[in-house]
């Protein structure tokens, strides 16, 4: 498991006083109101204190206390902001962070290894796990539904699924 979780990617500056535009990598954008600070993923010793934030067109605009000019903000462009796992919001039962799902080995209920999760698609109704198939040439798209996903073991690094008709075609 990762010690740090990505909460956003800084994509641009905003204005002249050091604000930045952030694409949120969290389901709950209001989560930023609970965060006192974030860290830069590529330099964990850099702590950025959130002075204020607002949401505009699905982009979070953040003013960090330590950044006061557009030139300083420009240096943050294309960098990820993270928080320590222990500061993350507690997830409900049978809910997982995407970073913990990616990389899991996928088995059917008979123990046959089907592949490895390489990405997660966010859809309107449920997530879809993209599995790099070991048994064929194309990816396996696994709906994240209780009827399909029967067991997830993050610590052991696997997921067991019920193979329904058409899933492996």
From Swiss-Prot:
Keywords per UniProt: Chaperone, Cytoplasm, Ribosome biogenesis, rRNA processing
Molecular-function GO term, any one: ribosome binding
GO terms under biological process: ribosomal small subunit biogenesis; rRNA processing
Gene3D superfamilies: PRC-barrel domain (2.30.30.240), RimM (2.40.30.60)
Domain PRC barrel: 92-167
Stored Pfam families: PRC, RimM
Main localization category: cytoplasm
GO cellular component terms, semicolon-separated: cytoplasm; ribosome
Keyword rRNA processing: yes
Cell compartments where the protein resides: Cytoplasm
InterPro entries given in the database record: PRC-brl_dom, PRC_barrel-like_sf, RimM, RimM_N, RimM_N_sf, Transl_B-barrel_sf
Domain notes per entry: The PRC barrel domain binds ribosomal protein uS19.
Family, similarity comment: Belongs to the RimM family.
Subunit-structure text: Binds ribosomal protein uS19.
Function of the molecule: An accessory protein needed during the final step in the assembly of 30S ribosomal subunit, possibly for assembly of the head region. Essential for efficient processing of 16S rRNA. May be needed both before and after RbfA during the maturation of 16S rRNA. It has affinity for free ribosomal 30S subunits but not for 70S ribosomes.
Protein name: Ribosome maturation factor RimM
Source organism of the structure: Caldicellulosiruptor bescii (strain ATCC BAA-1888 / DSM 6725 / KCTC 15123 / Z-1320)
Gene expressing this chain: rimM
